[in-house]
Each structure stands twice: as C-alpha cells, then as structure tokens.
Design a protein with these regions (language model features):
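N-terminal acidic, glycine/proline-rich low-complexity segments
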Residues: 1-139
Length: 140
C-alpha cells in the first residue's frame, strides 16, 4: 500500500480541503496510508479548523504538524475562522508536532517509500530534504 504525507497551506481556497477529502476517501477504501498532515502556513485558527475537518473526514488521530514560524498572510480565509469558532476548545489538547521531526519520524517508521504531496509553500519539504538528503533519496 502506498504511504503519503500531505503538506498543505490550508489557506483561503479549496484545493487543500479537496485534496484532504480525496485522501481520506482513499484511506477509507483501504487504498493508501495517510501517515500525517503538515500545515506550511499559519493562522492560530488553523489548528482547530484542520483538526475538525480531519475528524469529519474520518482522519482523527492522524498526526498533524504545523509550521508556527510560517507567514500569516492575514486576509479573510473563508472557512478557518468559522470552523474554529464553531468547535471552540474541542481540539485544544490535541498534540501538534513540528513539521520536520514529524516527517522524519513518519518516513523512518513507514513500511516502504513515502510520497509527499506538497500544496502551497515548500519550506517544510525543503528543510526535510536539506537535513536528510540520503534518507530522502532512499525513502521519499
């Protein structure tokens, strides 16, 4: 079975939500393993929003990492604010990891090669490759 990590900006458009929903459907059908999700853009509302969406997709418990140093472009995201407000503190105690250590751990623990789907900003993927070129060549 193919192993995936999704890296997404989870921002103002819908490509991220569609990609996550499609991956969740493939997981439910037993076609793939979604090892984790990385968010490479940051708003404080991102965490409860994406966790609620993942929960709704049947992906509760899937590891999540957020690049908290990523740029907050402000703006007016269509769904982050309303979803975060709707769920309140429901996800406040869910652990959120740092991107590169999580990706390295997931790649090391995987039972085969790992494919990374990159949507948005590539700084987390670039940092992973910079730190572990040899392991990336072998496993990603």
């Amino acid at each position: 079975m193919r192993n995936f990590i999704l890296s997404t900006d989870w921002w103002t458009d819908c490509d991220d939500a569609v990609a996550l929903r499609m991956l969740a459907a493939a997981v439910k059908r037993g076609e793939i393993n979604l090892l984790g999700v990385v968010v490479n853009a940051y708003l404080p509302e991102t965490i409860p929003c994406i966790l609620a969406f993942m929960d709704d997709c049947g992906l509760a418990g899937t590891p999540l990492a957020i690049d908290r140093d990523a740029t907050d472009f402000k703006g007016k995201p269509k769904y982050q604010y309303p979803i975060a407000e709707m769920v309140g503190d429901k996800y406040a105690s869910v652990p959120v990891e740092e991107p590169v250590p999580m990706m390295r751990r997931l790649i090391t623990e995987a039972d085969g090669p790992v494919e990374i789907i990159e949507i948005g900003f590539p700084q987390c993927l670039a940092a992973l490759v910079e730190i572990g070129r040899a392991s990336c060549r072998e496993r990603v």
